[in-house]
From Swiss-Prot:
Catalytic activity: a ribonucleoside 5'-triphosphate + H2O = a ribonucleoside 5'-phosphate + diphosphate + H(+); a 2'-deoxyribonucleoside 5'-triphosphate + H2O = a 2'-deoxyribonucleoside 5'-phosphate + diphosphate + H(+)
Any one Gene Ontology BP term: nucleotide metabolic process
Major localization class: cytoplasm
SS bond partners: none
Protein name listed in UniProt: Nucleoside triphosphate pyrophosphatase
Top-level taxonomy: Bacteria, Bacillati, Actinomycetota, Actinomycetes, Propionibacteriales
GO molecular function: nucleoside triphosphate diphosphatase activity
Length: 213
């Protein structure tokens, strides 16, 4: 049986994480609307958006370019829950700076929704689950915040920070799965795939393009 593993995300961090775990996915960015719905909490939001992203790719017809006996589509969505406030991607330097002034010296919960869809012979099986990791931030000085924001790294990442880049020095403690902080929990993903009858180790070391046999 040939398998095509699709990452429905343009996140470099998620791609690096999968590659480090021995999986070489096909990357198909989702065009889903990632707007936050009124009254939606972090768990509901990331669950909905991860599913929406996966189905956006599935329904786009893009998978037809990668024929395989079994198609696996993985989509994720991450936000930082800071005292009940949902922080996605700041997009602007000023917003990232404002967020960091609230975040420094405090804890937040990085919430990542994961959606896995497995398609075999036209039959779709899928599952959505949530990963949550408590992150403690260092008490940064104003100068450190300015320098970090000026680096450009915070603008395009959930919660305006990374753990695997410049922001790693500003994380003093993690309670939970550290992979989840990068936007994709490998232990959670493994369990989801097992629930859908996919053996994790069967996905290792696929040739470029995400096809395995």
């Amino acid at each position: 049986m040939t398998t095509c593993f699709v990452l429905a995300s343009k996140s470099p961090a998620r791609l690096r994480m999968l590659r480090s775990a021995g999986i070489e996915p096909v990357v198909i960015a989702s065009g889903a609307d990632e707007s936050h719905l009124r009254g939606e909490d972090a768990v509901a939001m990331t669950a909905r958006l991860s599913r929406l992203k996966a189905h956006s790719v599935i329904e786009s017809g893009a998978l037809e370019e990668y024929p395989a006996d079994r198609m696996i589509v993985v989509a994720c969505d991450s936000v930082l829950n800071l005292d009940g406030r949902i922080l996605g991607k700041p997009h602007t330097a000023e917003r990232a700076r404002q967020w960091w002034r609230r975040m420094r010296g405090h804890q937040g919960v990085l919430v990542s929704g994961h959606h896995v869809a497995v398609i075999v012979n036209g039959q779709l099986r899928e599952q959505t689950r949530i990963g949550q990791t408590v992150v403690t931030f260092a008490d940064l000085t104003d100068a450190e915040i300015d320098a970090y924001v000026d680096s450009g790294e915070p603008a395009a990442v959930a919660g305006a920070f990374t753990i695997d880049g410049l922001g790693g020095a500003f994380i003093t403690r993690i309670n939970g799965d550290p992979h989840n902080v990068t936007g994709i929990s490998l232990p959670l993903l493994r369990q989801m795939l097992m629930d859908l009858d996919v053996e994790w180790s069967s996905l290792w070391n696929g040739p470029k393009g995400g096809h395995l046999s």
